[in-house]
Amino acid sequence: MLLNRHNVAVAELRPIKVIQFGAGNFLRAFAEYLIQSANEHFGFNGNVAIVQYVSPHGASQINQQDGLYTLLLQGIKDGVAVQEKQIIDCVTQAINPNLDYQAFLALADLPEVRYIISNTTEAGIVFNSTDKFSDMPASTFPAKLVQLLYGRFTSVKGNINK
């Protein structure tokens, strides 16, 4: 059975405050764990929208589970080996801009968004001379980021405090 918000008791959806480029294991096990902890312990009250464009089905797999997944935590706590499972519920949605460019651009209009994170490697931070601002979407990570940031700048009418 898939996890989803109908069969697992989790927090209500919070406003999206973080746009995350990528859905790899590191981001899901580190960045989202920190956001989850900030929600539970420090009143962050924010969720994540994932921009996932490498795998054609990655976003839909995340959305099938309403953004929920189980994180396995292993380590030493107070000198004792521990192994814990935690359901991460801070992902609201995943969007593939190659399949739904308008939904990708709509992230720029979300009033609560304050952060963009990515762990894009040097292989993904490249210049492509054929990328155009009018491409829907551009092909490279930097160009997609520029499209999103320009959308945000336009949405907030240049207000740097938003």
Model-derived regions, located:
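Non-transmembrane, aqueous-exposed alpha-helical and coiled segments at domain scale
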Residues: 1-162
